[in-house]
Regions:
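Short coil/turn segments at secondary-structure boundaries
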Residues: 116-122, 137, 166-171
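A glycine-biased structural micro-motif
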Residues: 18-23, 89-100, 109
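Phosphate/diphosphate-binding loops
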Residues: 95-123
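NTP-handling and nucleic-acid-processing catalytic cores
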Residues: 1-80, 155-175
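Short acidic beta-strand-loop surface patches of small beta-rich interaction domains
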Residues: 81-86
Length: 175
């Protein structure tokens, strides 16, 4: 289903098989969006066809490829794991697993599907939910804990804030 957010196809710069098509564009089936064929060392000529679809919003390695090649980042998931408005309308709102099934069917119906193979792949699961974790870009912010700790220590040292029992203040300062 992440093909809905693909923004390039990468081939290895040393792979002579693809030299004549680097820089050209292809159209993503179902989506109809044109994407470029790019060169990037991340593409492994010995793995699969040697050409790799790049989805920067939903794969950590693809994100790095996207940054190196100034690729667009298209997020196709909501925070709840459903397909968002960046996908064709018939997929919007579908659960990611249902979307995957429908996309596969549509690829077969349109005769784009070539073959299916079983491969071993490491898939991350949540510790508590046991759900598959999908890479998902979000806004992040960071605080300077060292600067914040100055005031936090000060209020305990000056007794404006007290711990009961007192020995917990030692634990507080160790943190």
């Amino acid at each position: 289903e992440t093909m809905l957010g693909d923004t390039a196809i990468a081939v290895n710069p040393k792979d002579e098989r693809f030299k004549s098509i680097v820089g050209k564009t292809v159209i993503i089936p179902i989506v109809g969006r044109k994407i470029k064929i790019i060169e990037d060392d991340y593409a492994d000529p010995e793995q699969g066809t040697g050409a790799l679809k790049i989805t920067p919003a939903h794969d950590f390695n693809d994100y790095d490829v996207g940054q190196r090649n100034n690729l667009e980042i298209i997020n196709i998931f909501t925070e709840a794991g459903k397909i968002n408005e960046n996908a064709p309308k018939e997929y919007i709102g579908l659960d990611r697993f249902e979307a995957r099934k429908r996309i596969l069917k549509e690829l077969k119906d349109q005769e784009f599907f070539v073959k299916e193979e079983n491969i071993k792949n490491k898939v991350p699961y949540g510790d508590r939910s046991n759900s598959i974790i999908e890479p998902f870009l979000t806004e992040q912010w960071f605080a300077d804990a060292e600067k914040l700790s100055v005031k936090a220590k000060e209020v305990v040292n000056s007794k404006k804030t007290n711990f009961f029992p007192e020995n917990w203040s030692k634990t507080y300062f160790q943190w």
